[in-house]
A protein has these predicted regions:
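Conserved mixed alpha/beta catalytic, RNA-binding, or beta-rich assembly cores of soluble enzyme
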Residues: 4, 8-291
Length: 291
């Protein structure tokens, strides 16, 4: 059954930002879990070659941010961008050679992250202005009052196949179940800000670090077991959080591919259907909007 929501009462705010450059300092190097120093590309700028549906781990990168990394120069305006931009929202480039091209928000990290078609990404420069049609915060599931919704465009939620099942539970197709022990950096923060890094996906490093998550893909819908993200991020037995993988490979210990939260509530409220196709790439294609 289709979802009964308050989507008709949501408003859309047009927010502005710019493509933020990759940053560094003169010291450069970090160290991984085994004390090995590294200097690799990661956050910020325009990152080519990685999109929803592509693997999240195994790159020569640290804190990989696919597509465009977007923020605002004013601190408070930037926090509004972080808190109000939702996965699935439309992003439009407003300046530079690629002006007019559109993409989709795929999550939050240090920046708001947006995916575009590869040929369009290659025309975008750092400093280019963008707008985000922010819609989704305040969404409620009227027949699932125990489940908190956040950071997701209501149209995308339906495109992901989330619906009310015959038993009255919230049916959620998901690609992977993630054990609570995988949760790393990001715990304790607001769940409307940045994301949660998952340990155990250190592809190419020691097998003793593996939690079997090396197969995660950008855009995967994942189930975070015993995680309560309703009013923050923390461990709570008997609770489930649903997220979308928005960032990729990390070498820094305690970090990893990260899901942006979209649903959270008591585990008994959910009916999880494991499906390898539960990914933003499938949902975007099914909604008729390609990026």
């Amino acid at each position: 059954m289709s979802l009964n929501t308050n989507a008709d009462r949501l408003v859309t705010q047009v927010l502005t930002g710019e493509v933020w450059p990759a940053l560094g300092d003169r010291h450069g190097y970090r160290t991984d879990a085994d004390g090995v120093p590294f200097l690799l590309p990661g956050m910020g700028g325009v990152t080519l070659g990685v999109h929803p549906g592509d693997r999240a781990a195994g790159y020569a990168a640290d804190h990989l941010e696919p597509g465009l990394s977007i923020r605002h120069r004013d601190e408070r305006a930037n926090m509004a961008l972080q808190f109000l931009a939702c996965v699935g929202n439309t992003v439009t480039v407003r300046s530079g050679p690629a002006s007019g091209v559109t993409g989709r928000v795929i999550g939050q990290h240090a920046y708001v992250l947006a995916d575009f078609a590869e040929e369009e990404l290659s025309g975008v420069c750092t400093g280019d202005q963008v707008t985000v049609h922010a819609r989704g915060q305040g969404l409620r599931l009227l027949e699932h009052r125990d489940v908190v919704v956040k950071n997701v465009d209501p149209e995308l939620l339906e495109a992901l196949g989330v619906e009310t099942g015959s038993a009255g539970k919230l049916v959620v197709p998901a690609a992977v179940r993630v054990p609570a022990e995988a949760v790393g950096a990001g715990a304790g923060m607001y769940s409307e800000y940045a994301n949660t890094d998952l340990m155990g996906a250190y592809a190419g490093q020691g097998e003793d670090l593996s939690l079997g998550l090396e197969g995660l893909r950008i855009g995967d819908v994942v189930v975070l077991e015993d995680q309560d993200h309703r009013y923050g991020r923390g461990f709570r037995a008997g609770y489930t959080t649903i997220g979308v993988i928005s960032t990729g490979h990390c070498r820094l210990f305690g970090h990893g591919p990260g899901p942006s939260t979209i649903l959270s509530g008591p585990s008994g409220a959910f009916d999880i259907h494991l499906d390898a196709a539960a990914n933003l790439s499938t949902a975007f294609a099914g909604s008729g909007v390609s990026v």
